[in-house]
Every structure is written in structure tokens, then in C-alpha cells.
Amino acid sequence: MIVSPHREGGQAQFIAQPVPKNTRDARINCLLDYLQQHIAEPHSLDSLARVVAMSRRTLTRHFARATGMSITDWLTAERLRRSQTLLEAGDLPVEQVAEAVGYLSAVTWRQQFKARFGVSPTEWRRTFRRGA
């Protein structure tokens, strides 16, 4: 059984849907490992298909079946999850956090972060620093 951590004082849990990291498809698992190791790099469907020796169409189908999401959605979710960790544990300026997780635009990253978690990256960092 998986239980979400509890925070005292009515603080929001900030727990979003987990990003799948392991599937029953060995080639997709290899791709997920590759993407996690190269999260900051730009990726195209063609380049990812080459990594796992699949056609674009086959990769798209296998990835969606294995993870329940598109490659783009998975990458976005993983980049946002990784940025949470950097904000909580590090002192990188916000713009550098965006770059470290593969965003070319800090503005786009901020918008996606706030849409996903309901707070700005700066507010996220402040919340977790206060609790430390």
C-alpha cells in the first residue's frame, strides 16, 4: 500500500500524479532511463525512436500503452518533478532550474509549474524552505 506523506498544520500536500518510471516493456524502460539521464536535452520523436530501435509510430503506441501518457506529457511531468527537487534542495536561481530540467524558456516553465502545482516555483521553494 502506498500512503502519501502527511503534513501538519493544513499545509497542502503538493502530491501530483506520479510519473511512471518502470513498465512491463523493457525497451520503454530503457527509454525512460535514457530520458531521466538526459532530461535537460532537447528530444525529438525521431531521435528517441532511434534510441530504442523502433519506428516513430511503434514507439508512440508502445510508450502510451506502457506509461498511460504521451512522450511529451511524460517529459513535461518528469521535468516538473525534477524541478521540484531542485527547488526544494538547492540554491540554483529559478531561471537555472528551468534550464537544468530542459526548458528553453523560464517563462514557459513557470507557467507550466504553476498550472501543475498551483503555486509559482518561488512560492514552492519558500514553502519547503520554511518547513525545513
PLM features per residue range, with description:
Residues 2-3, 114, 129:
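Short amphipathic alpha-helical surface patches that mediate protein-protein
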Residues 59, 63, 108-109, 113:
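Short hydrophobic/aromatic patch on the recognition helix
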Residues 42-47, 54, 64-106, 126-132:
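Terminal helix-turn-helix DNA-binding modules in bacterial transcription factors
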Residues 120:
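Nucleic acid-binding interface residues in structured DNA/RNA-binding domains
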Residues 1-41, 47-52, 65-70, 77:
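Short, Lys/Arg-enriched, Trp-marked, Pro/Gly-tolerant hinge/linker segments that flank
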